[in-house]
């Protein structure tokens, strides 16, 4: 959609171009050894259907079928994952009414489990709060790292409280920390 306001953050709506550009870009950023001092880790963003929102409105809802999601919006991410991207950033948008930042079906079931992504799933800038979600919803959906730029003083204690209260299992935190450390090391 040419009215989409964040076209500068994408390779375009052509699936072949997404796949054509994703791998070389990631290889250029990460090189043969992402830990080498001259290289940086690549983040594939914005997962998923970020450019398919109704009327091209930024941070809106994408009303699409499962078939369209997989055919038009997934291939670039599959290529990015196969090319070794160390992280994937969630989209501010919603898919069929469900905010991506709070979607276990998209972030855990599809991205982590089905596609086998073992890197870090991170929020966009204050993405959980801006999506009207809680830290708990983000954690349960599969967010590993939160960009709590303005709200970190509340977010960090909230994560501790959720674990201590048994609302989020320690195994979920262990998984997130493992992914973050794998990326850093």
Positions of the model-derived regions?
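Glycoside hydrolase catalytic-domain context in secreted enzymes
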Residues: 1-185
């Amino acid at each position: 959609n040419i009215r989409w306001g964040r076209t500068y953050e994408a390779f375009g709506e052509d699936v072949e171009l997404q796949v054509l550009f994703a791998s070389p870009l990631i290889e250029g950023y990460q090189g043969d050894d992402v830990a080498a001092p001259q290289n940086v880790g690549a983040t594939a963003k914005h997962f998923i259907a970020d450019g398919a929102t109704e009327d091209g409105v930024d941070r809106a809802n994408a009303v699409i079928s499962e078939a369209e999601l997989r055919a038009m919006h997934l291939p670039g991410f599959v290529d990015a994952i196969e090319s070794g991207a160390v992280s994937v950033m969630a989209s501010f948008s919603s898919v069929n009414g469900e905010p991506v930042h709070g979607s276990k079906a998209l972030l855990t079931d599809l991205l982590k489990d089905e596609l086998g992504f073992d890197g870090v799933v991170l929020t966009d800038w204050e993405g959980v709060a801006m999506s009207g979600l809680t830290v708990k919803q983000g954690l349960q959906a599969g967010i590993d790292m939160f960009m709590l730029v303005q709200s970190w003083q509340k977010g960090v204690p909230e994560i501790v409280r959720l674990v201590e209260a048994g609302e989020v299992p320690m195994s979920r935190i262990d998984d997130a920390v493992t992914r973050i450390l794998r990326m850093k090391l």
